[in-house]
Amino acid sequence: MSHKTILETIGNTPLVKLSRYSPNPNVTILAKLEGNNPCGSVKDRIALYMMRDAERRGLLRPDRIIMEATSGNAGIALAMLSSLMGYRFMAVMPESVSIERRKLLKAYGADIMLTDGAGGTNYAIEVARKLVKENPEKYVMLDQFENRANVLAHYETTGPEILRDAPGITHFVAGMGTGGTLMGAGRLFKEHDKAIQVIGIEPRPGSTIQGLRNMTAYNPPIFTKSALDRTLMLEDDAKAFALAREQYGCQAHKAWATQALPELRVCRRQLSKGL
């Protein structure tokens, strides 16, 4: 299969059955491999939607720098798209982010502004918003935490793909970062069948897992907790890494791997049948 541009390779990621971890033959566990997106994460979807929305609204100009607070994946996706679409990009991120992510951002031509690691992504958001407010002609912030295009990306792509490939879905479990995946895909699932359970995974307060957040510390405007049926706390991330790598051959990054155990716990302990 050939594509005109790399943008056409975003989305339509496969579902993989995790049969080893479900001792009950009436319960099917599927993982959606968002790492198959060109920049390696689900954030490719929202980056494309936010960029196209900003272009339609006339917010992007060649002389204006796109600025985004990010722990890594959204920034990487925006850096790639900015390079491809002819814009400059600056990632504002905690100094605690990995060297590998910084190198990848620079490889895409992005500038990086590091903020105090103790403040995490929340402080990076404050810094980015302040800079944009003080320099509106120099910077534009797409703001994944407030941007409705984030939710729309999952409502129009992630959700429909899952319904297409797993039409009998009974439970949808996803991590809580910006909340976009849960709000967008979850809304579609509820419209399709109100009985589908939408479950959020969040880290414990003070966790340093990049890409996920405990919503008591900061509640993104696009996220509505009441839209979820319930939430679960993360398990041990080291154990999750080993599980994903050794049993399923998935080289998962930290945010995905740490979601694996609570998702599987739902299936093992609480379901007699389901998908």
What are these regions (language model features)?
Residues 1-275:
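PLP-dependent amino-acid enzyme catalytic core
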